[in-house]
């Protein structure tokens, strides 16, 4: 009897996370989109050289773009290519998804936040959150709930000993 090899690689497929977005916004919906990348960017992403903490998604002429995302070029990158680490990158989505996002932004006053960057097979994908901004008191409430959950877990763990 022959064992089948697992197709899943060891380790995580996540390249970068935007924890700040979950703190700053109420995430209503999550959408997956592809990205238009250059060769040196893909090589840098394989090394994990990405930061999406300050990134945001905007719509222009019916297309979606991500701005503020930094992909640091590798030292051994090609010399004939000028690498711009913070360039605006186009997102690849279907027309129906783009129209849906545009409608939600215009009608409901929502915003688009980049949540995570990850590998899906050999393609780089970005997870976009359709979000609404939090007020300061909402952020405080979330922190209190998180602290209370930690305290409950600590008490339960000590009571089971």
From Swiss-Prot:
Gene3D superfamilies: 2.40.280.10. The keyword Lipid biosynthesis does not apply. CDD domains: SmpB. GO terms for cellular component: cytosol. GO terms for molecular function: RNA binding. Keywords: Cytoplasm, RNA-binding. One of its GO terms (biological process) is trans-translation. It is found in: Cytoplasm. It comes from the Bacteria. Belongs to the SmpB family. Required for rescue of stalled ribosomes mediated by trans-translation. Binds to transfer-messenger RNA (tmRNA), required for stable association of tmRNA with ribosomes. tmRNA and SmpB together mimic tRNA shape, replacing the anticodon stem-loop with SmpB. tmRNA is encoded by the ssrA gene; the 2 termini fold to resemble tRNA(Ala) and it encodes a 'tag peptide', a short internal open reading frame. During trans-translation Ala-aminoacylated tmRNA acts like a tRNA, entering the A-site of stalled ribosomes, displacing the stalled mRNA. This is SsrA-binding protein.
């Amino acid at each position: 009897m022959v064992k089948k090899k697992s197709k899943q690689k060891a380790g995580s497929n996540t390249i970068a996370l935007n924890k700040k977005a979950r703190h700053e916004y109420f995430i209503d919906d999550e959408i997956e989109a592809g990205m238009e990348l250059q060769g040196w960017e893909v090589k840098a992403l394989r090394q994990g050289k990405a930061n999406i903490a300050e990134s945001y998604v905007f719509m222009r002429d019916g297309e979606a773009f991500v701005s503020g995302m930094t992909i640091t070029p590798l030292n051994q990158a090609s010399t004939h290519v000028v690498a711009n680490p913070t360039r605006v990158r186009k997102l690849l989505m279907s027309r129906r998804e783009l129209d849906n996002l545009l409608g939600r932004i215009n009608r409901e006053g929502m915003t688009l936040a980049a949540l995570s960057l990850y590998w899906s097979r050999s393609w780089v994908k970005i997870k976009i959150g359709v979000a609404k901004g939090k007020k300061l008191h909402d952020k405080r409430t979330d922190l209190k709930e998180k602290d209370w959950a930690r305290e409950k877990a600590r008490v339960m763990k000590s009571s089971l000993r």
